[in-house]
């Protein structure tokens, strides 16, 4: 790395590009195929760019301020990114995971200071799972109700419906790919 950074957010996305020479040879390709090694992001999560972008978008809209609590459902990757950036920006994070998610992911989340819940800790979700009425929308609504019921400001970042999640790639991925290749345009 050629520069000194002052916060973890400055490290996001500037991950190495690697030419996939073996793949090119195996498939007799004339074009170069590049892979972006996203696991080199600061938290080790491939979702760091999206997690940071969702937090930045919420801050810009005035939906988050230091001391607030972010809530999200995660299987791990987005949650790990959210945990890293929540900690560095002065937010608390509570994540809800499906039963059976790896202990290692839970430990990483906790190491960043996140509180980890299992989705069935929400009684209405446990009931919906048991009686067969569970849907993703029901779960999203239950998480929003959980946030609304808290005595302090809780913000459901809602990666599934948050435009800043895919927006991270429209806004940033092309830049992070085209700058090191000096092409300006990738096809």
Language-model regions, residue ranges each:
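PLP-dependent amino-acid enzyme catalytic core
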Residues: 1-182
């Amino acid at each position: 790395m050629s520069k000194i950074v002052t916060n973890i957010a400055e490290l996001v996305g500037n991950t190495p590009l690697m030419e996939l020479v073996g793949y090119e040879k195996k498939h007799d390709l004339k074009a170069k195929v590049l892979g972006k090694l996203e696991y080199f992001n600061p938290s080790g999560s491939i979702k760091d760019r999206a997690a940071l972008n969702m937090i930045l978008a919420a801050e810009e809209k005035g939906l988050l301020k230091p001391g607030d609590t972010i809530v999200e459902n995660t299987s791990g990757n987005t949650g790990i990114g959210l945990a890293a950036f929540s900690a560095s920006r002065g937010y608390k994070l509570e994540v809800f995971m499906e039963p059976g998610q790896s202990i290692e992911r839970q430990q990483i989340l906790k190491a960043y200071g996140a509180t980890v819940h299992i989705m069935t800790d929400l009684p209405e979700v446990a009931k919906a799972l048991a009686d067969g009425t569970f849907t993703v929308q029901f779960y999203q609504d239950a998480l929003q109700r959980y946030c609304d019921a808290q005595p302090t400001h809780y913000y459901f970042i809602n990666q599934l419906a948050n435009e800043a999640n895919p927006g991270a790639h429209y806004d940033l991925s092309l830049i992070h790919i085209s700058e090191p290749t000096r092409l300006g345009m990738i096809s």
